[in-house]
């Protein structure tokens, strides 16, 4: 026992033969030699398996761990390890193997173990202790094996975010193929279907196509004739085609008419936005047209070959007049429906009208220049055209901008005020605390109304009455707040209570200043009685000099109490000791502070200053 447990004992080293070996029977020595050979073969086999194990995948390693574990148990059981030489040659085979403990490293392969002669042939206590150690080793091995299996399962079944994101992106790409913004579900196929079903959009697309072809021809032909008027009219028409293309896109997208997670109110605002941008584009064109006209007034250009210029401008004028008449008629038809389509078509007709005016200006300037040689006629007509554009486009920009800014519609302000007055006189209504009215698109009004009502108010009846009164609102949200309902709030502060007591019996004035600071975070309850009677002498226990004055701002002159109700003597200054020597009387003053059954979420730190004037 002492040999094994000593510091010099080495289980991996075979000790020298000593006296105990001479007592062994030759057969026992032969058995021991066979056991050593088996151990050496086992070590070589494990070393070979280790090299193969490291080349396998994690699932195969996990499977081999289990197979190696079973082989180790069977081999240890068959080799006769774990014997207990308590008496005679009895053997006890169980789960505790002293000869071959199954220790594995992090990768799961078995480690060699060499038992000595003393370890194999010692007393029962030694064998039992070895068995206990092997029990611990076997337990550690099982834990390590379970951890390895768990880690392998995690590695094999772990969530791969990159694969998930790729699959999700593929699904989104399939759903939103050729999507305009990538997330709204507006595809080219959807736009083509709307174009096929919308007669206004179909005619606008046809007109834009014809006008675009003619505009490109006008630009190149004007450059060939060196006519600045034709080139300017061509670029002006090109910008108008771009603006009308925006209006066409707004018409097609706004036709969708349904909502989703991205556009919870639907797509009506697309057409509003397109109309607003189109009006702003008209103002931009009129501004530069005005600048160009001023420049041509100062330096009139010389136009060559007025006949060809007039013929090309006449063709452009005819196309524009047809477009103005058509879209103006459509705008009047839609105006009766109070829809944004009317505003959009009106803006388009203004675009075409501007093109018609510019074409007419080119024709008139060519006639005047050819007949009278007056070159400034083109510039004068261009200024008139710019003023007409501003007159028509500015109200459209103001109206659509008001919708985008969610202002209250002007035509509904009177109805809204009358409705609010009627709601205030309804049964159970105390006040209208908040109200919002705005237009999502022309003819689509949205509103939210918050009311303060009485406690016994019938919410359902009141809500139905309000909805009937605000029937002109398409999307109405009503919130009712009961009377006496307060929102939770937190408060804090410092209170200063000055008290001054004057006594007639004695010329003795007392002024008490109470300063209470509140710091939240503690709850306290107690019963504090302070009584001041006649000839009340206050005596304070002297404080040892080694105590230091407290520097905390929360210190006070009251006695603090531990959790076990033990009073703690507080610190006092020298001035307090001098004040304690004075005897003062308090007549007819009784202060009673009762804090029973009140739990406050704060602690009171009070400082009382006493000034005595004798």
From Swiss-Prot:
Pfam families: Cation_efflux. Residues 1-203, 255-270, 328-351, 399-614 are cytoplasmic. Residues 17-64, 121-176 have a biased composition (Low complexity). It is a multi-pass membrane protein. It is found in: Membrane. InterPro entries: Cation_efflux, Cation_efflux_TMD_sf, Kininogen, Msc2-like. The keyword Transmembrane applies. May be involved in zinc transport from the cytoplasm to either intracellular organelles or extracellular spaces. This is Probable zinc transporter protein DDB_G0269332.
């Amino acid at each position: 026992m002492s040999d094994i447990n000593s510091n010099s004992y080495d289980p991996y080293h075979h000790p020298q033969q000593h006296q105990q070996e001479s007592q062994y029977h030759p057969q026992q020595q032969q058995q021991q030699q066979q056991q050593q050979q088996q151990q050496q073969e086992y070590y070589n086999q494990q070393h070979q398996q280790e090299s193969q194990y490291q080349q396998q995948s994690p699932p195969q390693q996990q499977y081999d761990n289990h197979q190696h574990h079973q082989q180790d148990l069977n081999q240890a059981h068959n080799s006769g390890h774990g014997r207990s030489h308590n008496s005679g040659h009895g053997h006890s085979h169980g789960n505790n193997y002293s000869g071959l403990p199954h220790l594995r490293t992090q990768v799961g392969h078995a480690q060699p173990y060499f038992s000595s002669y003393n370890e194999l042939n010692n007393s029962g206590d030694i064998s039992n202790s070895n068995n206990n150690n092997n029990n611990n080793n076997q337990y550690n091995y099982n834990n390590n094996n379970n951890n390895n299996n768990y880690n392998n399962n995690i590695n094999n079944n772990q969530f791969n975010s990159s694969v998930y994101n790729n699959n999700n992106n593929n699904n989104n790409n399939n759903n939103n193929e050729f999507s305009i913004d990538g997330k709204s579900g507006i595809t080219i196929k959807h736009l083509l279907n709307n174009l096929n079903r919308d007669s206004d959009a179909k005619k606008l697309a046809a007109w834009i196509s014809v006008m675009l072809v003619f505009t490109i021809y006008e630009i190149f032909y004007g450059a060939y004739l060196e006519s600045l008027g034709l080139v300017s009219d061509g670029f002006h028409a090109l910008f108008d085609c771009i603006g009308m293309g925006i209006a066409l896109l707004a018409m097609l997208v706004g036709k969708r008419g349904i909502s989703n997670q991205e556009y919870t109110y639907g797509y009506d605002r697309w057409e509003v936005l397109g109309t607003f941008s189109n009006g702003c584009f008209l103002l931009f064109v009129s501004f530069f047209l005005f600048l160009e006209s001023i420049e041509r007034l100062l330096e009139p250009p010389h136009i060559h070959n007025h006949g060809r210029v007039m013929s090309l401008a006449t063709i452009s004028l005819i196309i524009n007049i047809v477009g103005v008449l058509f879209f103006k008629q459509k705008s009047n038809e839609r105006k009766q429906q109070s829809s944004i389509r009317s505003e959009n078509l009106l803006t388009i007709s203004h675009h075409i009208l501007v093109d018609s005016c510019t074409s007419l200006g080119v024709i008139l300037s060519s006639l005047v220049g050819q007949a009278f040689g007056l070159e400034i006629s083109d510039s004068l007509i261009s200024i008139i055209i710019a003023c007409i554009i501003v007159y028509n486009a500015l109200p459209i920009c103001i109206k659509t901008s008001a919708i985008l800014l969610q202002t209250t519609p002007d035509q509904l302000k009177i109805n809204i005020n009358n409705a609010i007055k009627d709601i205030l006189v309804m049964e159970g209504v105390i006040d209208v605390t908040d109200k919002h009215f705005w237009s999502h698109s022309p003819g689509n009004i949205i509103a939210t109304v918050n009311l303060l009502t009485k406690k016994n108010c019938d919410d359902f009846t009141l809500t139905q009455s309000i909805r009937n009164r605000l029937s002109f609102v398409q999307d109405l949200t009503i919130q009712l707040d009961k009377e006496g309902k307060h929102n939770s709030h937190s408060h804090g502060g410092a209170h200063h209570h000055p008290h001054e007591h004057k006594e007639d019996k004695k010329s003795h004035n007392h002024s008490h200043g109470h300063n209470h600071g509140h710091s939240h975070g503690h709850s306290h309850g107690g019963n504090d009685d302070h009584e001041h009677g006649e000839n009340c002498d206050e005596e304070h226990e002297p404080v040892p000099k080694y105590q230091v004055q407290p520097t905390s701002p929360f210190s006070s002159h009251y006695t603090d109490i531990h959790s076990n109700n033990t009073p703690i003597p507080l610190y006092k200054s020298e001035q307090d000791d001098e004040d304690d020597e004075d005897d003062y009387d308090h007549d007819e003053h009784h202060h009673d502070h009762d804090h029973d059954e009140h739990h406050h979420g704060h602690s009171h730190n009070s400082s009382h200053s006493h000034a005595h004037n004798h």
